[in-house]
Amino acid sequence: FSFAPPKRGDYTVVAVSPEVKAEGESLPLRDVTKVVLHVQTQNGWDRRAVTSKASAVELSPLTRPYGLVGGMAFHVEADEPAEGDRKALAGIVIEAERYNATPPKELPPDEHVTRTARSSRSGAAVVTLTEPGWWGVTAVRERDKVQHRCTLWAFVDKQSTDK
């Protein structure tokens, strides 16, 4: 994969997987993964990137998904993919987990690993990204006997101690 941005601004890179049947799972899974590529100027990070009607859930950032520091609230919006007007998905579970390249020797309880919220009637949800690193914010919805999962990645910077 190669991408050369034609101009400054923000670009949403989207990857859509085919349906995959995972061992031990009752339904096949279709993944949509999104990340905002920032190129020198804040322009377009909040633009909706509708991936496909084949997906049953979309996540869009309501908080700029870069320039974040630990402890910030991160707002997202869950909706059903559609051209034109959006259809908010109320009550969808939104999970946030920090990526660890090397898992810790002892895992803390799941409730300390995965932050969980539900979307409001308008489809909005808030999670707190507590530590530096890459965070995956994910919504899952079942439709037509397929688990549809959309993950929006956001990077949390180390807080500067310089004054």
Protein language model features and the residues they cover:
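Short, acidic Ser/Thr/Gly-rich low-complexity loop/linker segments typical of extracellular
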Residues: 107-122
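Beta-strand-rich domain onsets/edges
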Residues: 26-91, 98, 145-162
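Copper-binding active sites and cupredoxin-like electron-transfer domains
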Residues: 89-92, 119-121, 134-137
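Short strand-edge motifs at loop-to-beta-strand transitions and within beta-strands
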Residues: 1, 125-127
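Short, aromatic- and glycine-rich surface loops/edge beta-strands on solvent-exposed regions
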Residues: 7-21, 134-142
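Short aromatic-acidic-glycine turn motif
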Residues: 97-108
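Residue-level recognition of well-ordered beta-strand positions that form the cores
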Residues: 16, 77-79, 95, 140
